[in-house]
Each structure stands twice: as C-alpha cells, then as structure tokens.
Regions:
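Short charge-dense sequence patches
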Residues: 1-2, 18, 75-83
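N-terminal capping segment at the start of a domain
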Residues: 2-36
Length: 105
C-alpha cells in the first residue's frame, strides 16, 4: 500500500475523531490582541500532540506560550511545522454569518 492509500485509510478510520478535535480547537478563543484564551488553546494543542506521542516543551512568555513538539520517526530526516494558534479579534460580530468560535460543518 502506498503512502497516499495509507493516509486515506487513516483519515477515513479517524474522521469522526479528527472532526471532534478540530471543532474543540477552533471553538477555543485565542485572541492575541486581548491575550484571551491563549493558555487554554495552548493546553488543547499540547494535549493533542502528547496524544500522538510527541515530546512537548512549553515556553511561557507575556503573550502566547510557545509550543515545541518533537517525535522521532524511522528515518533521519526532519520535518518542521511552524504555525501559530492565535487569531485576530472577531469584531464586528454582526458581519459574521455564524458565531466565529462555533464551528459548523
């Protein structure tokens, strides 16, 4: 089975779980401008990473905790993801078709 088929099989087998995790993550406010929900959001991410076998380090600062996660694979190659989990303020709320932190599928 090739990589694409393996990935498709994994995603199909874990679709409901993946959707639930994504909904939990995007439901958490993490507005950097207000420093609101950033610690809680980082805790969700840390939990998701640990669940998948990553060794996680958290570096606190005065804005949003920095999360560094590492998991050794079978090869000596490195894959790096660099991302952010904070968002911009959702206002004005009346311009939204649905609540900004309530996922809809």
């Amino acid at each position: 089975m090739d990589l694409t088929n393996n990935l498709d099989a994994y995603l199909n087998a874990h679709l409901d779980e993946s959707i639930a995790e994504l909904c939990k993550l995007v439901s958490q406010t993490s507005v950097s401008a207000y420093k609101h929900g950033l610690i809680e959001c980082s805790e969700i991410i840390v939990g998701l990473m640990k669940k998948r076998g990553f060794k996680v380090q958290i570096f606190s600062n005065d804005v949003a905790p920095i999360i560094v996660a590492e998991r050794k694979g079978k090869s000596n190659k490195t894959l790096l993801f660099y991302n952010h989990y904070d968002v911009q303020p959702a206002e004005p709320l009346d311009l939204w078709e649905s609540p900004p932190f309530k996922p809809m599928i």
